[in-house]
Curated annotation (Swiss-Prot):
PANTHER family: NUCLEAR EXPORT MEDIATOR FACTOR NEMF (PTHR15239), RIBOSOME QUALITY CONTROL COMPLEX SUBUNIT NEMF (PTHR15239:SF6). Induction: Up-regulated under secretion stress conditions, possibly in a CssR/CssS-dependent manner. Activity of this protein is best tested in a clpP or ssrA deletion mutant; ssrA (tmRNA) encodes the SsrA tag added to nascent proteins in stalled ribosomes by trans-translation, which targets the nascent protein for degradation. Residues 282-434 are annotated as: Coiled-coil-M (CCM). The keyword Cytoplasm does not apply. It comes from Bacillus subtilis (strain 168). The gene is rqcH. Residues 179-281 are annotated as: HhH domain. Residues 446-570 are annotated as: NFACT-R. It comes from the Bacteria. GO terms for molecular function: ribosomal large subunit binding; rRNA binding; tRNA binding. This is Rqc2 homolog RqcH. Key component of the ribosome quality control system (RQC), a ribosome-associated complex that mediates the extraction of incompletely synthesized nascent chains from stalled ribosomes and their subsequent degradation. RqcH recruits Ala-charged tRNA, and with RqcP directs the elongation of stalled nascent chains on 50S ribosomal subunits, leading to non-templated C-terminal alanine extensions (Ala tail). The Ala tail promotes nascent chain degradation. RqcH, RqcP and charged tRNA(Ala) are necessary and sufficient to add an Ala tail to a model stalled nascent peptide; does not add Val. Residues 279-336, 368-430 form a coiled coil.
Amino acid sequence: MSFDGMFTYGMTHELNEKIMGGRITKIHQPYKHDVIFHIRAKGKNQKLLLSAHPSYSRVHITAQAYENPSEPPMFCMLLRKHIEGGFIEKIEQAGLDRIMIFHIKSRNEIGDETVRKLYVEIMGRHSNIILTDAAENVIIDGLKHLSPSMNSYRTVLPGQDYKLPPAQDKISPLEASEDDILRHLSFQEGRLDKQIVDHFSGVSPLFAKEAVHRAGLANKVTLPKALLALFAEVKEHRFIPNITTVNGKEYFYLLELTHLKGEARRFDSLSELLDRFYFGKAERDRVKQQAQDLERFVVNERKKNANKIKKLEKTLEYSENAKEFQLYGELLTANLYMLKKGDKQAEVINYYDEESPTITIPLNPNKTPSENAQAYFTKYQKAKNSVAVVEEQIRLAQEEIEYFDQLIQQLSSASPRDISEIREELVEGKYLRPKQQKGQKKQKPHNPVLETYESTSGLTILVGKNNRQNEYLTTRVAARDDIWLHTKDIPGSHVVIRSSEPDEQTIMEAATIAAYFSKAKDSSSVPVDYTKIRHVKKPNGAKPGFVTYDSQHTVFVTPDADTVIKLKKS
């Protein structure tokens, strides 16, 4: 648990410095659990994310772009009514709990001044965002409702008094003394890190393990000293926001994690840290839920085609015996005089072989020798004719596999909007039936929305995240002399630099983006081809997004999320 009470303390301090006194200019609710405040503060526009997601609950300033629904949810409408246009007077923390309270001064419909408190409770699957009337301490509404039958201690329903979750009888680390530490920790029994969590509020196992590690040989002298030093770092806002990666797993915190033996990366702020840590995680989780049926369908279709190829290859093996059937027919015809009906096999000399060996030819005893010879000629003709057909079927099935591999890759990095476009593509390709509900109007065709990036030198880079976007970008948006990029022989996005002569750094940055949005995302030294759009062609009858190209150059890059985040235009 990295977003513990200590982290909440640090984030509360950071937000007070950055947005206290700021005006809430817009409110959006892009997803069920997430609310975005657009805030004008300290002379610039900022976006504040409030998330009550069961797995990714958090609060921080974000630079990420979020897609808004065409119709705002009811909770979003309520927030707009009560606090849009209001000013954030201050932000405070409830003790050292993972609860942040935003004090917002606004005006109601008739112009009277009102003060609202917005509680953001960061508590895993119990996370919530609750708006209250500050004067009356009455709940106006919450993102999630909590009825008396669900929780006997507190109710979260409009009109009810707001009540904080039950307080834990623990010591505040920010006021703790050496005596407090020695009085509550037993050095003879039990794990010390667990005891620290049990006795001090706002402290997570991550913090406690760090304290024990810094104490070295933890005893009554070293551990209190290490704990008090860490408490002081938090209290005095001496934060070192970082992500430490150990065996591929990432940990984030506001203090250095010396007990983790891995690669650490520092950030300028806690918000920047969280923006990087959660980049794509919550969205991938949402997409996974939305696209479960789609992903299952695509994987099954790929499997069907793979099985089809196996069967066709067996048929091809049989078909390749055509020459043998022809030989049997000719040898039987040459030896009709020595055969009779009822024979089960024929022992004949193979005159076509230099060594003239005797071979055995199976016969149908119910047929005459002449009929047996004709049967082998018929088998020969069928086998010969089927080779071309079977090879064509194998080629088509292989194309289907490549197509579904492309879709699997696209689903792995898709946004909710991308999912809709992939579904539409499968409907148009007659793979799926349309999901149109009764009475629902047919949506008008629309141009896909492309992701936009800006290179260090200021050039625009456009990215297609699915086949519809790829086709739109490559065949309609890009100019003939723009530079087109794609991972070499690997499913991935089409990427276009809006320039005929980009600098080398821009090419490498665009190639990094192309590698990141490809099947080779987790690889190193990924080959990426680039060429001018004029050398990219779509074959007649090809599936959406499929192209051929020539006159390409190849560069090798390592996919890097930090580069993608840095270059993305919000």
